[in-house]
Amino acid sequence: MPSIKLLVWCCLCVISPRLCHSEKLFHSRDRSDLQPSAIEQAELVKDMLSAQQFLAKYGWTQPVIWDPSSTNENEPLKDFSLMQEGVCNPRQEVAEPTKSPQFIDALKKFQKLNNLPVTGTLDDATINAMNKPRCGVPDNQMAKKETEKPTAAQSLENKTKDSENVTQQNPDPPKIRRKRFLDMLMYSNKYREEQEALQKSTGKVFTKKLLKWRMIGEGYSNQLSINEQRYVFRLAFRMWSEVMPLDFEEDNTSPLSQIDIKLGFGRGRHLGCSRAFDGSGQEFAHAWFLGDIHFDDDEHFTAPSSEHGISLLKVAAHEIGHVLGLSHIHRVGSIMQPNYIPQDSGFELDLSDRRAIQNLYGSCEGPFDTAFDWIYKEKNQYGELVVRYNTYFFRNSWYWMYENRSNRTRYGDPLAIANGWHGIPVQNIDAFVHVWTWTRDASYFFKGTQYWRYDSENDKAYAEDAQGKSYPRLISEGFPGIPSPINAAYFDRRRQYIYFFRDSQVFAFDINRNRVAPDFPKRILDFFPAVAANNHPKGNIDVAYYSYTYSSLFLFKGKEFWKVVSDKDRRQNPSLPYNGLFPRRAISQQWFDICNVHPSLLKI
């Protein structure tokens, strides 16, 4: 009797998956206890036939339909009952690749973009270029509007109609094997996810400002710990976030349908994907626009600190570029090159990568709390004392160092104010002033009704002044006659005045007499007249920034700035008004790539 009950239970498990505690489609199990399977080696290009297959596969012969839902004609047949004996047809002569104009033309295009001699012949240099490790995404893809194949929605609709017809003709539904049930479930899930992705996009880019990503549970690699894998992916997403107005957040709790980008590792036929990996040595990974990223676990991926193997960080950054909408860029230094170029862990996104992604998503914009040039003295290699400066931008609780020679922020910024500037308020600084003369050298941060003096040598705020008075101090005590809170401030070395901005007024504070200068305050509109009519911030300035790079003063308000007419400008054009304001411009047009990152990525 017990054996009969056991048999019935087993049958129910096969027929009804819900009765069984089966393994989830996506789970979080660490597979480090499993023995890795033998690594397969990718087939190399070595002759005309394999070269022809390579050119066709990557879109050089003609653009390729790159669609995760496309069927793979080479997929092994699962139902052998459908096999039929083939019909014998007369043998047809196949043209040799070397005589095909299409093959020669494709070969020439490949050679040209890979900086090879354009010969149209399959020489050793061309074969070597084809055998370089690369991304699995085709170099030339067919535009969606050019494809005539049914979409995933149409395919699923047709499958549904066929199923309805069968149900109507056969009242008793056929028994579905459990494997086929899972296949249909995964297909419908993928269709739903694709439809949601279409709703998120305009057809070209994500329209959401916050994208969520996740490593799918089945797709962890055996080669690195789970924490190492997640760290690398967080860093790769941060690299893109530093140069574009999108945030990325790892989300391991929301339903899978709400995840924008899913990442995973696999070998050969993997993760329900229609594109099989080829083994070690050639394709490292592939990705889909607004979709998933898969990594070939036959490859030897390593952490950024390793000098050996394949940098998972570099491959991940490349594939994320595809998901965001970038194609391959045939430019030395670009992360979007199709071929993997071994490089140290210090690589960063090239100018071409940054401009390409900003062409899709726009540049980073936003107001700032303060901006300033930090002046300091140090000895050079000859022991001589030299004066240098670094440029900083503050926003909320973050700061960026701006590298003026490269016209971009320092790689790895922003950083938390609390970590870089010790003893001052950790967010929403109102202004910074550096009083720098032959006899004085003092730096001040202002917030609310108080100010802090900063010790640049010890990199922290002073606890007290020379008279033993503690910091922070009231602005009204240290700068008599100046109201608080202030909007912005800067120091004019020529006149030795600190100019404080509050609402629609500007105050000139004489540092030698420790008082407000005569005839002040004045209206900002009068003290800084507009060069062009009706083009003036009028009041509530965010930042007053004197730049030593441009030898000019800039007034920031919101996302825009006004450059103050300099002495050099007046020498070139005497008709310009003294302290006049040139017409507004976007801050992002003068200072590039000052981008926020998601708080979860701030500590990387």
From Swiss-Prot:
Disulphide-bridged cysteine pairs: C364-C595
Cross-referenced Pfam families: Hemopexin, Peptidase_M10, PG_binding_1
Sequence segments annotated as region (Disordered): 132-175
Residue positions the entry lists as glycosylated: N158, N165, N404, N407
Keyword set, alphabetical order: Calcium, Cleavage on pair of basic residues, Disulfide bond, Glycoprotein, Hydrolase, Metal-binding, Metalloprotease, Protease, Repeat, Secreted, Signal, Zinc, Zymogen
EC number in record: 3.4.24.-
Record bears the keyword Signal: yes
Swiss-Prot/TrEMBL domain comment: The conserved cysteine present in the cysteine-switch motif binds the catalytic zinc ion, thus inhibiting the enzyme. The dissociation of the cysteine from the zinc ion upon the activation-peptide release activates the enzyme.
PANTHER family hit by this protein: MATRIX METALLOPROTEINASE, MATRIX METALLOPROTEINASE-21
Family stated for the protein in its record: Belongs to the peptidase M10A family.
Protein name: Matrix metalloproteinase-21
